[in-house]
Amino acid sequence: MAGVLYDEEYVPQEPDYLYCPYEWEGEDPTQCDANVPSVSYLVEAVKKSFTEGNHDMLISCESYHAECCEGPLMNKGLTLSTYFMSYPGISLPAFGGGVIHVTSARVCMQAFYAVTPGRCSCSCGTQFIYRAKGGTGLTFDATNTISSAFKFEDGKVKWLTEDLGLALLAGCFLKYVPIPHEIEIKIERKVEPVSALDFWEPEGLISDVHFVHPQERALAPEPPMDVEMVRLVRTELFEHFNPTLLLNARSDFSGEKLKEVELPRAQSEPLVPRVCLPRGDDALIDQFFIDKAPEHFNREPATDQWQVESDDFTVDFPTQVRLRERDEDWFRRKPDFAVSSIRTGLEMPRIATKKEMLMAFSKRNVGAPQMVEVPQEIHVKRLADRFFRTFLKEGGWDKGDGHYWDDFFHRKGRKVFSLENCYDDPLSSYLVMLKSAGKFSLDLNFPVRSVPQTITYHEKWVTEVFSPMFLQVMARFFSRLQDWVVVPAGPMADFSRVWPSFEGKCLTEIDLSKFDKSQGKLLHDVQREIFLRLGFPPIWCDWWFKFHESSYLNDKNLGIAFSVDYQRRTGNTATYFGNTLVTMIMMAEVYELDSLPFCGLFSGDDNLIVTDRPLEGRVSLFPNMFNMEAKVMRPGQNYMCSKYLCTVDGRVTPVPDPFKLLKKAGASCPLEHLDDFYESFLDYTKYLVRDEVRTLIPRLMAHRYQVSMDEAGVALDQIMSWRKSKTQFFKHFQYRKPIKDSLEAVKSDFLSAFGKVDDRIRVWRGRRTNHKKEVDALKVPLVSFRE
């Protein structure tokens, strides 16, 4: 068992015995003796129960499995979370997909320990349904409902004695799982369910049990979520699991006081996984997400890729797509890494598969909207003229530095001259890859998995040839840029010379969607005209723009290729500079910026215009002329590139968005990069140390995210506490070993963890996906073993 990264090392406790206070009914070779270790009783009881009843318990990555639809239960399954995957050496993705059948309530109980403490509640979608004999059972589902956990006989609540594991599971859940919502326990009688048990207590634990008529359920209050109590409960579960829970039950319809029911004592075994828990003030971050972004808090990003690979997938392409046979495995061995204890719903890095790549192609590269309604060819020269009048100073232009180009050709030698003499080289062919880290959502209410992104790029020697040319053109562009226009290149620029203050100013921001794939022939030709006027050598300029008119994108690893026209290539030499020029071209035309005073900030597709009066423009030109979907952001805010532009001591300073930092606090990090991660954090938050900024930022956060200033201030204070020392920063990380990728190793871990008991463990694995075969994760047996 791995220790944590901070001073308090975790020492696994020695396994203890579990004693059974139950009175077994009928003849049973395992009649309870309080002096005998209960593990053996558990095994024997489970063997007897399942031998006679022939019941299976299914742990599955599917919420539904037809083989297990028996009796009154419509569903038997467990939707796994990442915390089950943190089981040392055990991970369903290591099997390549599929399900695990077990027939031991002890295995069932240990799996339950591994899943539920990793969540603040079961409301995140966890389903745990256990069916026992006699039509009774225990159910944990997405609504925090326990069904048929008790038998009600002769006016008394009685634990099921036929299955010790079931009683233990019920006791563990009731005592140690925090209750963010009302929990109901349905009591099944021989006739029909007649009542419910509502459990609630202000601090999130259960102190009393009473019967409530089903019609009165609406009157039962919902308990609040107390994060500090959640942390305490989880810590007790994993470090000091030794409960004795007394339920004082009273019957509202019989008037009799039911006898107290004592749950068995249970001591944890070393196989119970150590889940990283927020400590101290880190719990305030969880509280912030629970209160203001519950969807982020409850989201389980670790299952996103699994869901993509297991679900059906349909996509239409308006262009021809070439698919080739390739072996692929979306689960790959990862290095040792540190896991954050803060639940922010941050997406896991994507692994390139055919499904992910096809989804990225369909969303990012093909199917561009066709909204242009005006002739385009006649506008090229006029748009270029307006661009120069609006953003660049007049005079001082020449045709380029001939000495620079001569030196460039001389240094590049034979490679460059071979290109010059081989104009028909296939430079229209691009390589393509999937971007592993996508843009995550900052919407507090509706976090969704971001659309996957592709990166298209040339081979290294092509970039080596064209990069110096574009650097020279950019240098000429910046040397003639107007003083009231800022284009950040490298670190964020000093805005004080442009904007002394935002007070009393009107801010205009345009959100441009589908930016890369919507760029068509008009913007392509206007860029070419601008580059030529900036001194780009004509032969090289014509060549560059020629192989951007129609390109062939190829992913050699996944065997996917297709063609695109005109749109921006996201990884070529001029991506950032070209996107910035496109934004400036459109803004100058739509708002006629050459005829009014303004200050402007442009960076890629991000933009911010500052004027004395509200800006009026022909917004319809975005779709009708430029084929671009655009949304005017009102009211505008001094926010740009995920940074607030704050006025401090008469200077405009870019300050990173604390909420984005909080969101990224849920990221995991490889151990070898942890120190670099901390240094990057210090550099990114250096502007937050100023008192003026820390006073201003909570007000800006409250306006943007609709939270109170106190809540924003607490979040900001927590970020600043991480700057105090590296130890303080590392406290919300925990070490986790890499998942084993060997089936034999996994089998060994199963047997060592669960003991040498007569458990039937069957593992299925789906066929490797390709464009000719369908995944069948439930019917293809890969390995079967019995110990």
Swiss-Prot record:
Residues 505-619 form the RdRp catalytic domain. InterPro entries: DNA/RNA_pol_sf (IPR043502), RNA-dep_RNA_pol_alsuvir (IPR001788), RNA-dir_pol_PSvirus (IPR007094). It catalyses: RNA(n) + a ribonucleoside 5'-triphosphate = RNA(n+1) + diphosphate. Keywords: Nucleotide-binding, Nucleotidyltransferase, RNA-directed RNA polymerase, Transferase, Viral RNA replication. It is an enzyme of class 2 (transferase). It comes from the Viruses. GO terms for biological process: DNA-templated transcription; viral RNA genome replication. GO terms for molecular function: nucleotide binding; RNA binding; RNA-directed RNA polymerase activity. Pfam families: RdRP_2 (PF00978). Its EC number is 2.7.7.48. Interacts with replication protein 1a. RNA-dependent RNA polymerase which replicates the viral genome composed of 3 RNA segments, RNA1, RNA2 and RNA3. Belongs to the ssRNA positive-strand viruses RNA-directed RNA polymerase family. This is RNA-directed RNA polymerase 2a.
